């Protein structure tokens, strides 16, 4: 028998990187310094380190190899790698020992989806997990017992989703779920739950497989998602000692907890929380029960144990509150992109001390049916078939649909509902498969959605071995052809992510489209890869949400958008991408923009409402309870960049710039004017142009921003009843300045001017003007929305009523060429280099002006003969410049009077042309390739021509400046 168990064991296990985490370039943020200590490091703040202490800490991230049987073992005996056998030895044997001694034993598994719970508890293939090993060892020990003992093993398996219980060993689904009853002797029990007697491990294995199939069917048809439901497997183990008239009864509870939803990260905060709160309710109440029981064990006075507060705690009352020995396995991901979820899991495990795992069982009746079905299925192994795929690896390839000779309907995981939904609900009328003449074809019916290898089909299509099929929104299957076509292919590579990547590629979504060129080497950066992973993860969810909107006639259409945060950055850098969901109402044309987290939360609420609709509840839904409804809001349509470099030289800038939306397409054209002025508002002329921005240092600087009009607003073309507003914020201004709203105009005339003043222009402010752009946002107004406030209350103003900027010291802006040398394109660096090349010209001009003053003084004193003779040479910043002879001085003085004015004009022309070049560069960087492959070659030619034009414009601007200065 195993060594004696302890009453409570808490453990944590770290898995290897998943393929998705590898693709995202994830880094490991978890370390283990001993078998009991786990340390996490915040990826955003490496100095922020948290340490957690557990009874056991298993390092399974790396340092392993495969033995001859394919089992993972430590590559080096001195290393700390923990395999499946190590976990069972520490936890599984303790569970068995408790059962033999008559104690209730509970094993709890907790962790975010994909953290490795299923691998630790059930395992795959030869890498057997805790549950099957416990069952196998239990029957092995029974076989070695004496003849004076009788043993009885009973299995039951249920699922708890939103406080509703479902028996996974029953093919029939009871409306409203099973009920919990209470008996004075038995305590809480589930009325009508099937408990199946088992005589050997093979029966348990078949029951687990059967239960998993039933659960797979449920998740395939969008009922309780496996990651958001609790799974409870109970093994009732009874020992009867005939010679001693003694009976021992123990209950082994194997519980797989749903993942806990952190409201803030999931977007539930301030939104509807019912679905998420139902999931969290069981976890919270379980933690409360455990905490109270722990207080009681320490001798504290306990008035009430809240078993009745949730379904889960009612069922586990006898296991938690009696002679139970409980073990917890917290499964976590080591990736930095999962840091928040990992930290949440570790905190829960350390605080509550207990959590659970999953298992499976089946009924005696179902087992007989399975045997009969197996005898019928054996000869069918020669037919081609479909294998199901699921996001949960444990539910993948557990359903097999054989395609026999002739024509048969598409796989229907549950009884067909009437009327069948053309995409969401898969019925036998969705599509048909025909097996004839040694080939298999699939034919979609009516408007039903069918995709083969990611490409939608509308007519009869021949299937090839290992083709990928998607029926409806997200029912995925792998086609396995005739046995003659089988080879040594590795089917494991065709996982759920493979299907979604293929689907995304077929729909034109790729890392390149999302902006992969932001890495200087042409490779997608981590932010792009992370956004792409979010994009493909949300694609099937958006498709399902659209279908759920159709049948109840909600009239919504949802589509994915990718927001480039560079559109909100005044330097125009390619920053992090963000995936959003644009929601449009067909009838009213109202538009909403939902974040990823908000959409996911709403989608689960939509699923609940849709299930009620399927159950026959077609009554009206209050707005506050309708996840398809939201208050009308203002929508951000696009942004424009207006570079402020000319303002640093006191030059007026008037131009038309494009508002670009999140797709990089033109949303409207903005006509604006930015001009330096006097405190009284009089615009400066050419004579006020400065050669060097440093001349403005410490001086008062006033300027006006005049928003003239917008042209061709697409938002207004879609619905003439809409309106627009424009907002911008400059430098350290705490609030955004908004123009007055304009309704029902495609070309809104705005004509609003705001004057700003920097009382003592700082070096930081001047650097900002030289290197940054003014971000102007275009906002769309809808009927019933709240307009953006135009009030300027709270802003600091001068005595003349002008808004103050540059009011506080900030950190000196780093040189752009150093701060973003690895982020900005080569052409942008060339523009910066061009600015640096003008510095020697400015130095020469400054020195000539100083010498001009000396020459004027000399000429004034020439008549008296007292003038000092000027030097024939002048040193300028390490260079030697030859000065004019005495005979040329008089002529030079007459020409010098207009030189400053000519230089100012030349610089004005130069910076205006460079501003055009900078705008063209920004549009070039936002230029996206077409989705159609046939247009790729014209796109490459067009982009090459744009680069050539930009280079010519840069060279022309520089040549004009140099020639003007030399004349």
Curated annotation (Swiss-Prot):
SUPFAM superfamilies: P-loop containing nucleoside triphosphate hydrolases, SMAD/FHA domain. InterPro entries: FHA_dom, Kinesin-like_KIF1-typ, Kinesin_motor_dom, Kinesin_motor_dom_sf, P-loop_NTPase, SMAD_FHA_dom_sf. It is a peripheral membrane protein. Transmembrane segments: none annotated. CDD domains: FHA_KIF28P. ATP binds at residues 111-118. GO terms for molecular function: ATP binding; ATP hydrolysis activity; microtubule binding; microtubule motor activity. GO terms for cellular component: cytoplasm; kinesin complex; microtubule; mitochondrial membrane. This is Kinesin-like protein KIF28P. It comes from Homo sapiens. The gene is KIF28P.
């Amino acid at each position: 028998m195993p060594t004696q168990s302890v009453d409570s064991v808490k453990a944590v296990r770290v898995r290897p990187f998943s393929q998705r985490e590898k693709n995202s370039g994830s880094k490991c943020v978890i370390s283990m310094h001993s078998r009991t200590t786990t340390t996490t490091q915040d990826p955003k703040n490496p100095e922020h380190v948290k340490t957690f202490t557990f009874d056991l800490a298993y390092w399974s991230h790396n340092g392993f190899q495969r033995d001859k049987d394919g089992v993972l073992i430590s590559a080096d005996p001195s290393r700390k790698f923990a395999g499946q056998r190590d976990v069972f030895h520490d936890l599984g044997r303790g569970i068995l020992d408790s059962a033999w001694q008559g104690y209730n034993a509970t094993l709890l598994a907790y962790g975010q989806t994909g953290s490795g719970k299923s691998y630790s508890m059930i395992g795959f293939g030869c890498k057997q997990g805790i549950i099957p090993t416990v069952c196998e060892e239990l029957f092995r020990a029974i076989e070695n017992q004496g003849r004076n003992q009788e043993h009885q093993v009973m299995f039951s398996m249920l699922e708890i989703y939103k406080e509703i219980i479902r028996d996974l060993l029953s093919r029939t689904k009871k409306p409203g779920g099973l009920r919990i009853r209470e008996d004075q002797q038995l305590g809480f029990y589930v009325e009508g739950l099937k408990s199946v007697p088992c005589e050997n491990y093979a029966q348990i294995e078949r029951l687990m497989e059967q239960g998993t199939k039933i659960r797979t069917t449920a998740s395939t048809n969008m009922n309780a998602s496996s990651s958001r439901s609790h799974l409870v497997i109970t093994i009732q183990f009874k020992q009867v000692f005939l010679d001693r008239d003694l009976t021992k009864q123990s209950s082994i509870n194997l519980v797989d907890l749903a993942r806990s939803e952190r409201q803030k990260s999931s977007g539930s905060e301030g939104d509807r929380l019912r679905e998420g709160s139902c999931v969290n309710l069981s976890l919270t109440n379980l933690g409360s029960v455990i905490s109270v029981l722990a207080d009681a064990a320490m001798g504290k006075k306990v008035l009430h144990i809240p078993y009745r507060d949730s379904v889960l705690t009612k069922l586990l009352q006898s296991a938690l509150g009696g002679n139970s020995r409980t073990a917890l396995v917290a499964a976590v991901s080591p990736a930095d992109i999962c840091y928040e979820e990992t930290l949440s899991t570790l905190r829960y495990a350390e605080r509550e001390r207990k959590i659970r795992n999953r298992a499976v069982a089946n009924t005696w009746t179902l087992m007989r049916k399975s045997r009969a079905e197996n005898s019928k299925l054996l000869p069918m192994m020669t037919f081609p078939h479909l294998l199901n795929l699921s996001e949960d690896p444990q539910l993948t390839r557990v359903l097999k649909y054989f395609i026999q000779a002739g024509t048969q309907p598409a796989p229907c995981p549950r009884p067909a509902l009437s009327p069948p939904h053309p995409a969401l609900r898969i019925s036998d009328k969705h599509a048909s498969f025909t097996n004839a003449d040694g080939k298999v074809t699939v034919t979609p019916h009516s408007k039903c959605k069918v995709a083969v290898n990611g490409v939608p089909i509308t007519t009869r299509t021949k299937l090839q071995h290992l083709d990928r099929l998607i029926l409806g929104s997200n029912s995925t299957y792998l086609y396995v052809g005739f046995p003659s076509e089988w080879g040594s292919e590795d089917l494991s590579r065709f996982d759920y992510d493979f299907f979604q990547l293929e689907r995304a590629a077929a729909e034109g979504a790729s890392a390149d489209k999302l902006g992969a060129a932001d890495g200087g080497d042409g490779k997608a950066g981590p932010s792009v890869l992370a956004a792409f992973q979010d994009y493909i993860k949300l694609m099937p969810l958006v498709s399902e949400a659209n279908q759920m909107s159709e049948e109840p006639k909600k009239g919504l259409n949802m589509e994915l958008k990718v927001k480039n945060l560079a559109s909100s950055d005044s330097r125009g850098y390619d920053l992090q991408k963000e995936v959003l969901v644009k929601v449009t109402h067909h009838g009213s044309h109202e538009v909403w923009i939902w974040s990823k987290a908000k959409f996911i939360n709403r989608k689960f609420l939509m699923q609940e409402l849709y299930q009620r609709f399927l159950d026959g509840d077609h009554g009206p839904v209050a707005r506050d309870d309708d996840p398809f409804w939201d208050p009308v809001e203002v929508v951000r349509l696009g942004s424009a960049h207006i570079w402020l470099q000319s303002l640093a030289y006191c030059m007026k800038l008037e131009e038309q710039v494009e508002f670009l939306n999140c797709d990089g397409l033109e949303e409207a054209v903005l006509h604006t004017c930015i001009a330096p002025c006097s405190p009284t508002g009089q615009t400066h002329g050419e004579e006020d142009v400065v050669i060097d921005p440093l001349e403005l240092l410490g001086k008062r600087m006033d300027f006006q921003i005049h928003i003239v009009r917008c042209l061709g607003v697409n938002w207004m073309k879609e619905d003439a009843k809409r309106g627009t507003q424009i907002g911008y914020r400059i430098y350290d201004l705490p609030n955004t300045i908004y123009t007055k709203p304009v309704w029902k105009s495609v070309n809104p005339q705005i004509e609003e001017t705001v004057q700003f003043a920097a009382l003592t222009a700082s070096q930081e402010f001047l650097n900002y003007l030289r290197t940054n752009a003014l971000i102007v946002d275009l906002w769309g107004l809808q009927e019933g929305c709240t307009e953006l406030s135009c009030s300027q209350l709270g802003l600091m103003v001068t005595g003349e009523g002008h808004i103050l900027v540059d009011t506080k010291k900030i950190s000196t802006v780093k040189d752009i060429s150093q701060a973003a040398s690895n982020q900005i394109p080569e052409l942008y660096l060339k523009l910066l280099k061009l600015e640096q090349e003008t510095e020697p010209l400015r130095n020469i001009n400054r020195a000539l002006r100083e010498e001009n003053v000396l020459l004027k003084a000399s000429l004034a004193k020439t008549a008296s003969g007292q003038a000092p003779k000027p030097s024939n040479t002048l040193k300028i910043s390490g260079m030697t410049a030859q000065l004019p002879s005495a005979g040329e001085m008089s002529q030079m003085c007459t020409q010098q009077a207009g030189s400053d004015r000519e230089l100012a004009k030349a610089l004005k022309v130069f910076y205006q042309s460079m501003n055009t070049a900078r705008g063209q560069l920004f549009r070039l960087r936002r230029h996206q390739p077409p989705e159609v492959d046939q247009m790729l070659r014209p796109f490459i030619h067009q982009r090459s021509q744009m680069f050539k034009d930009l280079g010519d414009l840069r060279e022309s601007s520089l040549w004009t400046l140099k020639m003007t200065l030399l004349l």
